[in-house]
Amino acid sequence: MGSRLNLLAMLALLAPAAPAAVQLIEGPTPIPGGNARAAHDLTVVNERLAFALAVGSSPPYGVPRGALIDLAPVSGGQIGPDRVVFADFIPNNWSAWPNTYQRVDVLERGPDTVRIRAVRDFGQARIETLYTLAAGADRVAISATMTNEGAAALPQLLSGLTLWPSSGFLFPLPGLAGVTSGSATGALARRVSAYDATWTITLHAPYAQQVGSGSRDLFLRHTLAPQESRTFSGWLQVGARGDLAPVLEAEIAQQQLPAGELSGSLRGAARDARADFVVVIEKQGQPYAWTRGRAGHYRVRLPVGQYSLYATARNFARSTPLSVTVSADSARTLDFSAPAGPGRLAFAVRDARSHAPLDARIVVEAGEQPVVEFLGRRTFFTALDPPGQLEVPIAPGPYRLRVTAGGGVLAREEHVAASVRPGATTRRAVDITRTFDPPARGWYAADLHHHADQAEAVTPPADLARSQLAAGLDLLFVSDHDSTANHAALAALARARHVPFIPGIELSPSWGHFNAYPLTPGAALEIDTGTAPVGAILAAARRAGASVVQVNHPFIPYGYFSSVAAGVAPGGFDGSFDLMEINSTVPEDDARVLAQLWQYWNQGRAYYLSAGSDTHDVWNEQSGRVRVFVHVDGPLSVAAFAAGLKAGHAYVTYGPIIYPATMFGTQLPAHSGAALAFDVGSVAGLSKVELIGDGERRETRTLEGAPVSAQVSFAADPRLHWYALTVEDQAGRRAYSDPIWLSTPPEAHLP
């Protein structure tokens, strides 16, 4: 009854004629699609926004309870869909979070202000976070104080607030586009915005000196002496329209910046452009912000400075850019001429030999690439049905496009020029010659770390399928964080395209991630990965049907092997996994993964290689950037693929192809004359081949003339225990193999 009364009170609060007020609701959140569903979770709502704290629910990524996990705009008395998976403080990058307690207290209950305090521990540190929402405010104030209660200093921490959206697009710190992690020096503002056409969420973090995860994490690097405290203050600003003008207004007010106003109109434009156009604002040659016009007019306040502005709309060209100097308290008029309207672009992609249609990925290399991503894509995929076909609206103008079928592994990419005119369709037919056909020799590829649209991932199942097929992968695969929600949809898509589907999950505690697959149809996560020790997590994977468990990105800050080394993995080291992952988001860790596996092979332990791209967004990341090839005897099936992978009949590759005369994971036959022979290749041309024996480089062959394919053979030293191969091509891409044993292969791990 209490929960129902709270909901009725909230509805009264959100009525258009209601006075400004803020309401606290205990229980499952009323935010549509929200994840705070437990009896004691807290939702705070006013007439501009709603947010929810996980008190009883389990936050994502193994973060302790007491965190902000839902956030949504409110417009016209209606709460919009949840737009975040997590937006809160993290104490030391995405590393393990050792935790023993959480307390959440309500300090003020409204109607003018709601203030909530969450207290949690992080090892020897105490973290107290205050969340404040006032009536009528469009932003949540967050203040996190971290205190070292231990006897030793906590050095070189990367602490700060984060914004992990669950949908839409991300506009990183202005001036830092393309910077995944590192210094925020050069940033034009200390804010990051998640957005789509109907909403914005902006994290303002004035303290930020470092960025992580492509500006989703805004950090300060610091050291906490014993008993020392440091406070991190920021704001989560929410809007019900994809417009950054209110964000600029808030930034000006928060920092007390001198500012002026620009306003104007879009002259001569068609009705659809005038109704909903965008003015993009650049500063120092970098995208800085944008504002959306209404009925042909716009208005925006900007800090004092020099800017360049242009107008555009969905699939429209850009207007001629205009330069302007904004001075304090100025008010200037800046009108734009109408940009050219949309054209269409159509592709037909096929195999040059058989003329069969090919799934393809098409990327704009040169031409219009909208800064505001809801105005148009830069990456496209051919249709699932009919395959090989694409037709899309696009801004007019000249283009250079890169077309790939096979992810640059099976065939060379093609570069296509096209000129698109307003109101017309430009058609291009592209024939692609496949250089390699691994399935003809029993080799099949998959990307064994790939997300769809759960948690922070933004790829619907159909687009995952289009992307993986365009990469030339032979099996579809998904591994969403702690979720099996997309299994049924992807199974149906795979059946329609007559390809196998491997249903997986990424088990995601704060101290290490594990992919488990193939899962039993209908299986769901049975444990809380935020509190369970490693043994319970791996056991749950096996109960769900997984014959294969791989350790994902083992050596990143929150990777399992890093956490074991730091003593923060609950349960310590548990060896009941099967594979270690080469992850293309951290290629600098490849050598560490290989060194660990080589050590295991020296010990006669049957842990083998896996590979995954860790793709979350197929339009801005590449499925199959690294992939695993597995040899299967007979017809391809999920069970046969998993068995071959687990038996070490595999190699991982960023590009080169390997066909061994003696199968990886098996024993070199005595009658072979102790010779190791391989066919190798790469569409980019080969550079060198390295033979690894017992963990050391035994021989390197440089391949002169950059051949596309070659045969190499080596004499085997019978005193060694195993050999493996590394192949590098002219593009610097590598392939790494599982071992060929010179003695009886060790037994694979039993599930």
Map each language-model feature to its residues.
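Beta-strand-rich recognition/accessory modules
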Residues: 24-32, 36-38, 43-45, 56-58, ...
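Extended, loop-rich substrate-binding clefts of extracytoplasmic carbohydrate-active enzymes
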Residues: 36, 86-137, 149, 211-216
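Short, well-ordered beta-strand segments enriched in hydrophobic/aromatic residues
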Residues: 44, 51, 140-148, 678
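A short, solvent-exposed beta-strand micro-motif common in secreted/extracellular proteins
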Residues: 304-315, 362, 396-407
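An acidic-aromatic substrate-binding cleft motif
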Residues: 427-476
